[in-house]
Structure formats: C-alpha cells, structure tokens
Amino acid sequence: MSNASLLTAFILMGLPHAPALDAPLFGVFLVVYVLTVLGNLLILLVIRVDSHLHTTMYYFLTNLSFIDMWFSTVTVPKLLMTLVFPSGRAISFHSCMAQLYFFHFLGGTECFLYRVMSCDRYLAISYPLRYTSMMTGRSCTLLATSTWLSGSLHSAVQAILTFHLPYCGPNWIQHYLCDAPPILKLACADTSAIETVIFVTVGIVASGCFVLIVLSYVSIVCSILRIRTSEGKHRAFQTCASHCIVVLCFFGPGLFIYLRPGSRKAVDGVVAVFYTVLTPLLNPVVYTLRNKEVKKALLKLKDKVAHSQSK
C-alpha cells in the first residue's frame, strides 16, 4: 500500500433507490440474511448428525454452506447499516480492504469449489465402481484445501493490486460494498494497467471454472444417457440438476458484472444484490427442497428434537 494514500475512510453510496424504500429494503434484506445464515447452519447441522450423509458429495456441500454463510455476512450487515444509519455509510480504509479481501476470498473459493463438485459428480456417475477408491477421505481433504488456498491467492492479488495505489480523494464509492472496480475509480494514479490485470484474472478464474464445469456436465449427461434403468437416470439427473441451478445462479450475475463491456450503476447494483444477497440463500433452499436424502435427514432431526422435548 502506498504512503501517498491520504484517505482514512471511504463512504459507501449504497444501492441507487428512493429514500422511501429504505425501511422496506432493510426488512427484506434482513429477512433474507437471517434465512441464509439459519438455512446454511441447518445444513451443516443435519450433515453433521446424520451418518448417512457422511459422503463425499455432502462433505463438499458443508464447505459450500460454510462459504455461503460467511459470504453473505461479509456484505449484507454493512448494506443494512447503509440503509438505516446516516453514519453507516462510512467504512475505514482498512475495513474496506478487509471486506474486499474476504469478498473475493469467499467468492473465489466458492468458484473453485463448484468446479471440484462437478468433477465429483462426474466421477460418481461415470465411474461408480471405482468412485470410492478414487474419492477417498484424503483426496477430498486435499481437494477442499486446494479450493481454499486458490481462493486466498486469487483474493490476495485483487487486494494488493487495488490498495497499493494512492487514494487522496474523493472518497465516495459508488457501490454498497468495497469492490475493486468502483474503488479504482478513486485512485490518484493511472489504473488502466491494473484494471486490465484484474479483468484478466477474474475472467480466467470465473470463465475458466465455468467452462470446465460445463464440460463436466456434458460428460455427465452422456454418461447418464447410457444408464439402462429409468430410475437410475432420474436419480442422477435430479442430483445434478440441483448443482446446475446453484452454479448458474452463482456464475451468471458474476460474469455479467465483471466481464460485460460498459457499466450502468443501477443495473450493476441490482445484479450485485442477486449475487451477494440472494444466491447464498439458494444453496439451502435448492439442496433441501430438491434433495430427498436431506429432507429425510431433516425429518429425522425434527423427530429427535420432538422426542427429546416430550421426555
């Protein structure tokens, strides 16, 4: 970080909206945030207590739930503060740096994790007899660890490139969170080279993972079509459909914001809300409503709680 950085704080401009919508938006985002945290905590609890869910797929799902819970926590509380407190828009320089780092750290890790999960589904469906020998506990741990390390490296690049520049004013960030593109507009130096590097790195990570995921699912579909029983086909399609829905909702808005030419604040703001506020909620919703094993485990947990309370 340069010594020429004179700013000690930034002001988040928040979402572009009419002031009369402050209270309704606060209520909606608060409800979504609480549901996101509770929903993902519930998935973690159910998988933890039900031994039938101690499988590779659910091991990666616990990582995903943990990421989504904290991904939402990094952005939504500050967004809520900007809606109800005049002073809530202010964020210190170092807090802004931390928010950018963890935003990209968790987002990048989730991106890599989706790639790993697609490989896991491919191996499970295409090589069912060899699957357990290939996806051992050690292999799963190494894969999960690699996603977290890759996300950390990706985020460190974003943070270092963004905050080594001098910032001497103005300090109004045209966003509701600290992200590289709006922050770079405030730098007191030429940012064209850094913007290009960030664009390329985000593009390689997001587009690369997405393309590899698509290729995995093309191979999965080909493998499913070779399954002889209709019940086997239906179960395989159902399992993969849940993952595909979450993947599309995660990558779609992200690619739209970072890789499209030009920028419109209102459109970017709405898409960013979907990406940072609503997408983390989709994980518990999709994986509980569409997954029979998780629903069965939830019912068992409910019965256990009811039985313990009746004693």
Swiss-Prot record:
Subcellular location field = Cell membrane
What cellular-component terms does GO give this entry? plasma membrane
| GO molecular function terms noted in the UniProt entry | G protein-coupled receptor activity; olfactory receptor activity
Q: Where are the transmembrane segments?
A: 24-44, 53-73, 99-119, 139-159, 197-216, 237-257, 269-289
The residues that the database entry marks as glycosylated are N3
Ranges in a coiled coil: none
Q: List the disulfide bonds.
A: C96-C188
Protein's membrane topology: Multi-pass membrane protein
Protein's UniProt keywords contain Repeat: no
Q: Which GO terms fall under biological process for this protein?
A: detection of chemical stimulus involved in sensory perception of smell
> Per the record, what ranges lie on the membrane's Extracellular side?
1-23, 74-98, 160-196, 258-268
Topological domain (Cytoplasmic) residues are 45-52, 120-138, 217-236, 290-311
Q: Does the keyword Transcription regulation apply?
A: no
Keyword annotations: Cell membrane, Disulfide bond, G-protein coupled receptor, Glycoprotein, Membrane, Olfaction, Receptor, Sensory transduction, Transducer, Transmembrane, Transmembrane helix
General function of this protein: Odorant receptor.
Q: Which family does it belong to?
A: Belongs to the G-protein coupled receptor 1 family.
Task: Report the protein name in the record.
Answer: Olfactory receptor 10G8
This protein's species is Homo sapiens (Human)
Q: Which gene encodes it?
A: OR10G8
